[in-house]
Amino acid sequence: MASAKIKKGDSVVVLSGKDKGKTGTVAKVMPKEGKVVVEGVNMIARHRKPSQENPQGGIDRYEAPMHIAKVAVADPKDGKPTRVRIEEKDGKKVRVAVKSGETIDG
């Protein structure tokens, strides 16, 4: 799989699925699986039975990984989804939003 242009800490917009349109910050990138974990998006509930460590039991809610193609980097200018281009500025490679031309990092 090609290297992802989405990095940990990026602000992203969900493009499809039950959370379409939501924005969040990337908590984890899994390039080998082609998935990302976005804070507050794609929440799942895990029902836990009471055990020795957790005598109460209960429901744990956490973010599940989602396919990297379902998210796009949010444009720093207006927050809408944009593609990312890599340019060289001052001898360093930086990521640039295609829509606005703003640098995402660097």
UniProtKB/Swiss-Prot annotation:
It comes from the Bacteria. InterPro entries: KOW (IPR005824), Rib_uL2_dom2 (IPR014722), Ribosomal_uL24 (IPR003256), Ribosomal_uL24_CS (IPR005825), Ribosomal_uL24_KOW (IPR041988), Translation_prot_SH3-like_sf (IPR008991). Keywords: Ribonucleoprotein, Ribosomal protein, RNA-binding, rRNA-binding. One of its GO terms (cellular component) is ribonucleoprotein complex. Belongs to the universal ribosomal protein uL24 family. One of its GO terms (biological process) is translation. Part of the 50S ribosomal subunit. One of two assembly initiator proteins, it binds directly to the 5'-end of the 23S rRNA, where it nucleates assembly of the 50S subunit. This is Large ribosomal subunit protein uL24. It holds the Pfam family KOW. The keyword Lipid metabolism does not apply. The keyword Acetylation does not apply. GO terms for molecular function: rRNA binding; structural constituent of ribosome.
